[in-house]
Amino acid sequence: MKKKTIFLAMLIMLIGIMLAGCGQKETQPAIGIIGAMEEEVSLLKETADIKKTTEIAGMEFCEGTIEGKDVVIVQCGMGKVNAGICANTLINNFNCTKIINTGVAGSLDNQLDIGDIVVSVDAVQHDFTVEAIGFEKGEIPYTGRYAFPADEAMRKAAVEAVQETVPDIHVFEGRICSGDQFISEKEQKETIISNFGGLCCEMEGAAIAQACFLNDTPFVVIRAISDKSDGSHSVEYETFKGEAANNCARSVLEMLKKL
């Protein structure tokens, strides 16, 4: 009798678990798209068929579709902390299996003109240093690396999308350097170039890259050049950042067709 009672209790529990599972809707894989500023995501949000908006950590995560693809678009705010939190939330709360970071950047290489677009080969944090305790400049302790590589298939799709969307603009592939600073002095720029090389600098990409690396999630960073990172084009930054961000966003829209 006791065994029968235990069996019935276990059976009831199992049925309850199964019924609870049937009531849950599985979250479909999505592509996460991150921009730091409103100008960097406004076109994407206008184009998307937004189904739902959820606020987490002061950020609005907009779930919808673009070109038949499930996407989650979010303005994360400036800086590496915001960007890292945002990427991790997209991956773990919204089941994003790919992450795209779009926006503007300052050039580090003289061959880049304002308006040109950079697609990341990898990303580094130019302001991260623990050399005093034996690590290389920029190296993230206990990860064995300082540069986080972008996904090759996403890079290819991004380059093709730029070439097809804005064919009169040059597209480059290379390193993106990130730090919690707006680089506007020649000395700052030269230090970054000396330490890490790179094609452009901004404030979010490498944090997103590290979060994706830790979560084993493919990513790519796409940045349009808005200034020269040396203070010589401060007026141009305000004038062209909107256009540059828009060209980047248009390229992302085309890229989604290829993913």
Language-model features and meaning:
Residues A9-M18:
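Bacterial N-terminal signal peptides
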Residues Q28-A48, D70:
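Short, conserved "active-site rim" segments that organize catalytic pockets and cofactor/ligand binding
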Residues Q28-I31, T54-L259:
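Glycine-rich phosphate- or other oxyanion-binding loops that anchor nucleotides, phosphorylated ligands
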Residues M1-A9:
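Bacterial N-terminal signal peptides that target proteins for export
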